[in-house]
């Protein structure tokens, strides 16, 4: 079970800065009876896709370069076979088409966000963030911050089967978080539990941080937030995405 294995996902950062790493989901893991990435995951048809979206969010927001074998983006159930082409016909089905579009959106976010693709080996640019969730160590709730190129992104992962309603996250004073990607968005085949309004911090200490923000996460989901520093500066301004750079307009 996933409970009790919390530190297996955090362990990678204990030795990350000693060498140069590639994060692979290669063909070796999807052949010879090992099942595809999607089919390895436990649960119903919908839960498999939800977990897969959360898994790839973790992969693309984790420091290090990525390697995904061809076909992973289709969410296929048949193992790779060198004697035939990929299962392109899967894109006719809504669940697979939604997953493909989510994968494309996630890859674009990675490629266009300095916080995700620059300074991976500068330890000052990555930090685990504590939460108040009782599920953190027993149910798989993770949060971390990536910073580079004048941009800060915060990723929150809920690998548990329980919803997180009003989860507290410690932060600096006068912090605003803007959700820029949520794996549970209905566009990607999710149930629609998102955080559409800016999350403004309030001055209640949380795990050593001077302020707190509250957010919601569906079971088996992940969200990425762009961080800004002044609620007053954000009043009356809408946020948009321009080539992956997040700016007020």
Features from the language model and the residues they span:
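C-terminal beta-strand-rich structural cap/linker in extracellular carbohydrate-active enzymes
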Residues: 196-239, 243-248
